[in-house]
Amino acid sequence: MSNYVIPQPAQPSRPVQGTDARFPVRRVYCIGRNYADHSIEMGHDPDKEPPFFFQKNGGNVDSSGEFPYPPFTNEVHFEVEMIVALKSGGANISEADAMQHVFGY
């Protein structure tokens, strides 16, 4: 057990339906295909370069969690993401083999 100078947050995880197991949430890679207008606004061609970004685990809130924000906030923007949880890594995976790498949704 490490003695951290600054306490580390707990490992984010999600329950696996029908079991008592949990799936760890480590890295979330996002492809914003629905961000075409914003991509064009930023000078990019979304058909050639799909917007790609990372989601920080600390920013993830599930349906049972709270979303803290400053009390005098007048406007809050939110998004809902659909995720695919992978059970194995890989690169250049064919479409025919892709589902072999999926743990769940």
What is each model feature region?
Residues 1-16:
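Extreme N-terminal tail/first-helix region
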Residues 17, 22-105:
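Glycine-enriched loop-and-adjacent helix/strand subsegments that border the catalytic/binding cleft
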